[in-house]
Amino acid sequence: DMFEPMARSGIYTRQQHATRVLQFATSNDQTFYVRSEGVALASNSHTTRTPNVSTTTGFDNLATAALSPTSYRANRISMRQFRNDRAQICNIIADELWVPIDLEPRAEEILYSDKHPDSAENRINPEASARRPTTIKVAHHWTDTNNWCLMNSVLRKRNQVWWERIRPQYRTIGDFDTFQIKVGGRGRWGTMVLDW
């Protein structure tokens, strides 16, 4: 029981570090992400080192629209048109929708309603019967209620690496004469993003 508050604090800190990449994706935060481009992880200014390649289309992974059925669908289409370093279409299919706690109900409306959530015309909702359903992932540590993003789970796991150098460890030491106890804990972990 004496370790419980310390363990809870450690878990909270680890989760903050794990979601920092998403929390600061639109700023040039280089705590866990450093690129030769010198732009944010989510940016409309991505470049390529391949000579004579136009970055006019397919290199913009920044969207600023509020979460709605229209913006969700537009971003899915945009992801399918992302290009690699040689400007070839990658056809990346989003299967995860990441949202803060505040947007979870809106995400559920968009993805799971049988009918179009913002229409009185009784149109069908194509997301509700998608062949590859999208999973809602709630980022509990996001503080901006406008943040949301689409990801491909396979590429996310491949490109955002998490490692634990030292798993959380706890120990106590007691003094025989005074019955005083010291409690300590430690852990070392890190994360990095290999590619946007």
Question: What is the predicted role of each segment?
Answer:
Residues 38-84, 91-96, 102-196:
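Sequence/fold signature of self-assembling virion shell proteins
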Residues 14-50:
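Glycine-rich, mobile lid/loop segments that gate access to catalytic sites or pores
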Residues 18, 84-85:
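Catalytic micro-motifs at enzyme active sites that drive phosphoryl/nucleotidyl and oxygen chemistry
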